């Protein structure tokens, strides 16, 4: 396996900065603010698919954001287990057809559009209509932790889980989360903020170890806004400590210790967007049941060879083999 030095380093690496002392108190207080079940609309859509019921869910998130999600539930007399899917940065939730694969195994699926990105969720007070990308990572970092864009997204996810868990068709004790890149980060956030999530699959998770990202000089599209903030707003890095201290409250590695359910992670060793070292800053802070798989030849790209089967097995308990069956 190539790059043995990196493989050795990632076994123990936990990130450049420690968790703020009041981190859990901050998030517990933020969750308390949204602990009441929000008003929501769940509208059924008839797509002439006889085996499932399809719904569009909308609710008001923090700071007047409007959150939209697609919901697919297999028709069943029993309560169904459910998977929350989260999409990549600047993207949108799954198409309806993408969600149907899991219903064959008896699982419901919810796919949320992140506010202000390419789907139907809206960014509220910041921009009531349309796409507000880019700048989501850095937004609010100058004003303070209460103003962070991703703080609102994380609370949207908490509320989403609460709404879905309250539905009579859903088995609230069998909830999972799944995603890649930003989606992998948000799947972990779902489990960290809401212990109802019992199982998480994260593929090359984003939003981790911001200090290391800055030191690496990551100018990929995903992290470009962090680089550009310092290049064009603070070239002497006079505010670096304050910015890093604020971003610590949305750093996924700092949420890892809160996760109680099982976690599986997949990493491409050639990833130059969400560097493997930053992903393992999350993994090595997990205290729950966990496992990972590394793909040495893969970068931050579609992982279509056996990975979808592996994820399906992890989430649904199936036993699809990882070889060509003749």
Can you name each region flagged by the protein language model?
Residues 94, 100-103, 107-155:
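Cap/lid segment of the alpha/beta-hydrolase catalytic domain
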Residues 258-259, 265-267:
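Short beta-strand/loop motif that positions the catalytic acidic residue
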Residues 269-274, 301:
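Acidic catalytic loop of the alpha/beta-hydrolase fold
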Residues 294-312:
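Histidine-bearing beta->alpha loop at or near hydrolase active sites
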